[in-house]
Amino acid sequence: MKIKAISLDIDGTITYPNRMIHEEALQAIRKAESLGVPIMLVTGNTVQFAEAASILIGTSGPVVAEDGGAISYKKKRIFLTSMDEEWILWGELKKRFPNVKTSHTMPDRRAGLVIMRETIDVETVRKLIKELNLNLVAVDSGFAIHVKKPWINKGSGIEKACELLGLNPKEVAHVGDGENDLDAFKVVGYRIAVAQAPKILKENADYITQNEYGKGGAEAIYHILEKFGYI
């Protein structure tokens, strides 16, 4: 099945390590768009951030935010869940670990907690979820710990975005660098891991870039365009 769209993680995939957008990735994205290949930004960040990034970067596809819990396309936002058990977990975390912190973006979020990974480790969060018998999962993105419902992930978000585009998810290639990109890999037709990605992501990739971070993201986009006959 021919790839007709590309979904891209943002942090670490089209950026420098400091999260600034990489010029080569920006050029590659605009090349893909000029060839009629829509780019979907897929991020754990807020829908507001993703919408702004899409405008500034110049992507035409839907944006998938909050690790799949929020989709925005043509000025319409769709939220796939709400938070309830997440707040139960957060209350218990604060009691036991007073120094634990959430992201400053939490007031804008509606689909999950984002906990700063320098204030607690993901295994501690997972143990507490199990102890409290909550129907939640904790995933380390490499930048933060995302806590959400099990059915909320980048894969389910991409599936919903594809409905809006009229595409089969197998017609999408996904590029990412974190553990939270695994769910995207499960639904798309072609998978690329950026060079600094964890071993488990690389093991499930069809292609691994030679370059890291945004330079690797650019390499991935050009690889897709060449492999599927766009250039």
UniProtKB/Swiss-Prot annotation:
EC class: hydrolase
CDD domains: HAD_Pase
SUPFAM superfamilies to which the protein is assigned, alphabetical: HAD-like
Entry cofactors: Mg(2+)
EC number: 3.1.3.18
Known role: Catalyzes the dephosphorylation of 2-phosphoglycolate.
Name used for this protein in its record: Phosphoglycolate phosphatase
